[in-house]
């Protein structure tokens, strides 16, 4: 009985590790596909919205100083 329980626990742990590693590998693969895909190398700069008319030059200078 103890042996069966130990085998069950080991199987459960290995199955859990396989499930989690499969999800991680799938996310990595999707990231690579998105990076090198048809639209993957497009401009993903989301900071363009910062430079609208409502932000003053002093604000932009302050942001540049923070980013350095």
From Swiss-Prot:
The protein's role, per its UniProt record: Peptide with unknown function. Does not show antimicrobial activity against the Gram-positive, and Gram-negative bacteria tested, as well as against the fungus C.albicans.
Annotated positions of the Phenylalanine amide modification: 36
Protein source organism: Scorpio palmatus
Propeptide stretch(es), residue numbers: 37-68
Family note: Belongs to the non-disulfide-bridged peptide (NDBP) superfamily. Short antimicrobial peptide (group 4) family.
Taxonomy, superkingdom: Eukaryota
Tissue-by-tissue expression: Expressed by the venom gland.
Keywords attached to this entry: Amidation, Antibiotic, Antimicrobial, Secreted, Signal
Residues in the signal sequence: 1-23
Name of the protein in question: Peptide Smp13
């Amino acid at each position: 009985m103890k042996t069966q329980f130990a085998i069950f626990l080991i199987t459960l742990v290995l199955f859990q590790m396989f499930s989690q590693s499969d999800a991680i590998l799938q996310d990595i693969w999707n990231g690579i596909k998105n990076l090198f895909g048809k639209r993957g190398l497009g401009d993903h700069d989301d900071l363009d919205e910062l430079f609208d008319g409502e932000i003053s030059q002093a604000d932009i200078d302050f942001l540049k100083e923070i980013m350095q």
